């Protein structure tokens, strides 16, 4: 009779541990589910960090992207970009020689996504702006950008 109680206790304990593991795994899965149809997007732009003190960029605060910060060769903050990709400003094309590089919040991957392939607003990356084939703003991406390639090429 004691063996039967011990087996029941062990079985109960295994079930509780299994449920705990299942719940913890489910909490870490991205709950965003996107449909599989392809979007009809023309291109995407993702503001990225560019330049360095040794390799400066040619830009000015007006044409710099909102959300990106611009710095001098010495690392001194110059400005935040003023141009909104959804509604671009008419800016002069001159280079601000005080600006050497930018730091943007999303800095993985390419700045220009063309062609977009089967990207939709749902599968597009947060912080990236997607435009139709006519060049008009469609949406901002909704999915988190992968941090690293989990399956490197063999």
Swiss-Prot record:
Q: Which InterPro entries match?
A: Prot_inh_I20, Protease_inhibitor_I20
Where in the chain is the site Reactive bond for chymotrypsin?
93-94
Site described as Reactive bond for trypsin, located at 36-37
Pfam families under this entry? Answer: Prot_inhib_II (PF02428)
Q: Name which cysteines form disulfide bonds.
A: 34-122, 38-118, 46-128, 58-95, 61-79, 62-91, 68-104, 121-139
Domain of life of the organism encoding this protein: Eukaryota
Instruction: State the UniProt keywords alphabetically.
Output: Disulfide bond, Protease inhibitor, Repeat, Serine protease inhibitor, Signal
- Can you say where the sequence repeats lie in this chain? 31-87, 88-147
MF terms in GO: serine-type endopeptidase inhibitor activity
Please give the family membership noted in the entry. Answer: Belongs to the protease inhibitor I20 (potato type II proteinase inhibitor) family.
Protein's name according to its UniProt entry: Proteinase inhibitor type-2 CM7
Native organism: Solanum tuberosum (Potato)
